[in-house]
């Protein structure tokens, strides 16, 4: 009998844990604070499962508990849960403060990375518009005007371009638009994670995108 294929990354293990222990782990929505010592419980319950090693399990737990979604759940007085969802000790203020500090630091680092990435992107300029005397048209433009017999008109209404999201906008419930095809689609932020932003479209589908792909919905702007 062949051995089952082993998991190779944390994402696969988290999906497995959410399926095996749904009252403890989740991959979307609000996370639940984990019982202190949950690793030992997992190691014992999964001892016979050859698909996940203790090393990968440990790194997966670290990845899960460092996510923004999980850090949001660490509030003073909230109860931790075991693998079966049974509530246990309440979270102390010290632990809640530490989680908030981790969350703030992680958000700051993510903002710096986005800022650095934007700074590295070259400004797109239309070189054809440079060094052309004011009022002079290109040969192609003259030919097109002659052929049509009329001057080209821009019938598009003057609209304000959609606003980019600020750090304060990156939170659950923010109305946004996301460009998945030719036209932007309305969506709502459901989760803000280090590896991307989860948004839910009007169709109900949830997708993960980069913050750069999002714009603030017009209804949210003043």
Curated annotation (Swiss-Prot):
Gene Ontology biological process: post-transcriptional regulation of gene expression
Record-annotated membrane-spanning stretches: none
GO MF annotation terms: RNA strand annealing activity; RNA strand-exchange activity
Record's compositionally biased regions (Basic and acidic residues): 94-113, 133-148
Family: Belongs to the ProQ family.
HAMAP family according to UniProt: ProQ
Task performed by this protein: RNA chaperone with significant RNA binding, RNA strand exchange and RNA duplexing activities.
Protein name in UniProt: RNA chaperone ProQ
Organism (species): Alteromonas mediterranea (strain DSM 17117 / CIP 110805 / LMG 28347 / Deep ecotype)
Gene: proQ
